[in-house]
Amino acid sequence: MDSLPQISVLQTAWQWWRYAAAFEGYFPATSRLFGVLWEFARDSTPERLRQRYGDADYDWDYRVNTTSGAVGWRDRLLGMFHSSYQPTEPAAFHEMLNTLEQSPAGDQNGLDLRDYTFVDLGSGKGRTLLMASDYPFRRIVGIELLSSLHLIAQQNLDQYKSESQKCFLLESICADATAISFPDGPLVLYLFNPLPESGLRRVRLNLERTVRAHPRPVYVLYHNPLLEHVFAESTVFRKIVGALQYSVFCSG
């Protein structure tokens, strides 16, 4: 088996600071760096730990491990420079998928999810992959940068059992979401703020290239769209749904 990539905390912090300094200047970037470290220290308190375990109902119901409470200090610190691990609430996810099934792009027949591959960028421990399996996707793929979270996701996928499961081709891949090759065929891409703005722009450009090279329908479900403007600036994607907690973009 090939060894999984290991991410250096110091190298990640250095790259984060260099990028911030290039746009903001040395002193503002350094101030932000200390702010990140202070927030990490606050996030390590017992009260914050209890809050991270607050969404454990899903794990109890399905005997899996997807909460953020059990994430170690190293992965939490890395998350401060990328995007902190936060599992998706089931109610919000199913609302987004129901919106897709109602065909917001105007197709009277609705989307036939059997034609679509579901891809979660920044899939963490795999909760979204498990919830997506309630729908008849052709295939479900998660991309996770941190090897420790990826390994937990694999365990969750192996032991998950649900009477409502409709898709059984589930896979977690340990890789950099900004450098992947997207699967062929129609796609549903799920984002829950997995990347800083620079990384999200690389994802968008990569996605635009693959849509131009191989035209097909691609839907982007953007949960908690703090960086929505990155996709709003695209000439390939257009916004078709804007709700309080999410936005939906589609190609064409």
Predicted features and spans:
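Conserved SAM-binding motif I beta-strand of class I
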Residues: R139-E144
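Active-site segment flanking the S-adenosylmethionine/decSAM binding pocket
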Residues: S172-R212, R216
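S-adenosyl-L-methionine
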Residues: D2-L113, H150-D184
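Glycine-rich SAM-binding Motif I of class I
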Residues: G126-L130
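C-terminal substrate-binding/active-site "lid" region of AdoMet-derived donor-dependent transferases
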Residues: S198-S251
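Residues in the short beta-alpha loop(s) of Rossmann-like NAD(P)-binding domains
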Residues: L146, N156, L226
